[in-house]
Amino acid sequence: MEQADSVTFYGVAMDGRQGISLDNFSVRGSSGLHLRSIPLHTLCDFQRLRPYDLIVVQYGLNVATERGVKYDGYKKGMLSVIEHLKTAFPETSILLVSVGDREYKNENGDLRTMPGVKNLIRYQQSIAADSHIAFWNMYEAMGGQGSIVDMIGQKMANLDYTHINFKGGKHLAGILFETLMYGKEQYERRKAYEEE
């Protein structure tokens, strides 16, 4: 029997055979670029053992900065991440979810949406378009400019003016679910129309 010096675990699955299964590969503070470092053969094993219908990629909030204008390096890296995932999961749909609102205090001490957030979202839209994957703008779903402040007022976000909490996540998940179901309904209508 061979012994290894170390072992890397990506998770343990204890799902039933019915219903929806959700795997979450979260890394706090990650830009998402770490996904490139998962060996392709490991991802292909995931595909073989746990074939996914949908992969949701939602990273990047800590990439946004107060003065962030260009995120070309991030875009290049994320394009390679998406390509890596598409290679391992060729039959799986991929959805890129944008960053949400993030506030900072301007020179007058007023809370404002960090300028880098809007710029990063434009880059994320471009990543999705260039990769031919779906895109969902969480910033707009939150309410756009200054929305994290409103969510804090509704106890749906943390006082760091950056991160939503469980209640906020549940709220946004409901909006995303409705969006996905609407898209599915429209797809089925179009498909039925084309088959007539």
Residue ranges and their predicted role:
Residues 89-94:
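A short helix->loop->beta-strand "cap" motif at the edges of active sites that frequently abuts
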Residues 40, 101-196:
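Catalytic His-Asp segment of secreted/periplasmic serine-dependent ester chemistry enzymes
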Residues 23, 95, 134-136:
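Hydrophobic/aromatic beta-strand patches that form the interior of the parallel beta-sheet core
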Residues 74, 78, 82, 121, ...:
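Aromatic/hydrophobic pocket-lining residues that form the small-molecule binding cavity
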Residues 1-80, 87, 163:
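Conserved SGNH/GDSL esterase-like catalytic core that processes O-acyl groups on lipids
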Residues 57, 95-98:
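Short, conserved beta-strand edge motifs with alternating hydrophobic and charged residues
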Residues 27, 60, 99-101, 141:
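Active-site beta-loop-alpha junctions enriched in small/polar residues
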Residues 44, 79-86, 125, 173, ...:
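Generic hydrophobic alpha-helical scaffold/packing signal
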